Amino acid sequence: MNLTKTIQLEYYKFRHYKPFLVILGLYVFCFLLSGLSIKSLLDWFLKQQEDDDVLSHFLKSGLPIFDFVDIWQNLAWLATIFKWIPAFLIIISVTLEYSQKTIKQNIIDGLSKKEFLLSKLSLIVVVSICSAILLFLLGLFLGLLYSPVKDIPSIFQNISFVAAYGLEVLVFLCMAMFAAFLFQRSGVTIILFLLYTACIEPILTTILQYQYKWKVWFFPVEAINRIVRVPFQKYALRFVYDHVLIQDVLVAGAWGLIFIFLSYWLLKRRDL
């Protein structure tokens, strides 16, 4: 089964499933709304700080948040906040196969377990690519609207953060897919996945890093989050990585492969 057919298979399964379409629409809406409202929020914040002469002067001197070169990393990091929405989409797409017994029917109809996994991976790839395209279009629009520099070299400098964001979404969705194959029930999977990725691992790595001085780059969520690093400290004259680090890509990519392998292992090992 080729990639086109696996994509078509997923499309026919969920094209009329309203919760799937609602979550997808919510992701696009939140993504665009947050990007388009940043300028208004900054203007509001500036107005609130008018009495603070030092901070007001610093802010009014110009933070190049929307300038080309800076905008790609800034938006890519902000957009990662919403990666849980497509993750829930993937969880639902997998767990629904178990609850409605469609996975068993697909296998009976001649679809191999490998092809079934590829159909889910094709959905992940499509969502990740569309997320990167959405980020590119939003960044291009905001940059052309607010950036004082609009020459072609400046526009495409640091464009690698768009691809990095796509990779971050892809690996995170692979993790969500593994969780869905592991627990098989949508409600349980969403709760446990959210708890681990948003609470348990971040708290654990913070304690290990700052109290015990451990290196935490090998934890899965930490590795995924490191692909696009927090950029805003540079506006307070602190050092930040203003480019995508190859080691971050390799570690996160390795986790993506691990999640795919574990998903396939679970699919092969368990009865349907």
Predicted stretch roles:
Residues 26-93, 117-184, 198-210, 222-253:
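Secretory targeting signals
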